[in-house]
Amino acid sequence: LDKTSSDNPKHIEVLLPYDAANESGSTADATFAQGVFKGIWSVLGPYFKDGKAVSPSGTLTSSSTESDWVSVAFDAAKSERVKSTLAGRLGMDKDTSRHTRIDGIISCNDYVAGYASEELNDLGYTGSAADINPSITISGIVDNITGKKDLKKQSVPDPAQAPESDDGDSDTEDTSDSLDEQNSQWPIITGYGAYVSSIPNIVNGKQWMTALENRKT
């Protein structure tokens, strides 16, 4: 993001799972969801403010604050809700012929990340994290795990300005197809929890990363 231009910003969505009512029907404690978004926004907020990051859905803007966590929160109790929420954010469905550009999806756990990946696949997005950084190799991953080297994922830098189509050009249709091909590229998808079920998606590049922490300390 530091190398991103406001003329060609990164398109990012935040998927924050939060059920406003618990199993007993009473209001759920929002402390955890608020804390998660506060951490996310402490990093992303400055980029949104400078126009280097935008939300395709408009749920987050340059004037958003950490108090706007509810705008990206949704009930993720059912898998179909995760998928429909993402499709709605992108303004797409399975019959949409053109793709909405999405560079990153901040999924706050591996459960959400998994179904976000499934929905992107259903919508026709293609590729994987390996396309974002082709320098990542199996041997490099093994060396990283064994402590022989540090492996850093770095994306190929975007041009300073987003490509524009010229309606007066005879090649407008070709340009449009080329732009849609770019827009349909697989985004970075983050997760959390190191769920066993998420490992295949990380191995095949559909999920960028996961994380875990020792809560006993």
Predicted regions and their residues:
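A residue-level marker of the well-folded mature domains of exported/periplasmic proteins
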Residues: 1-217
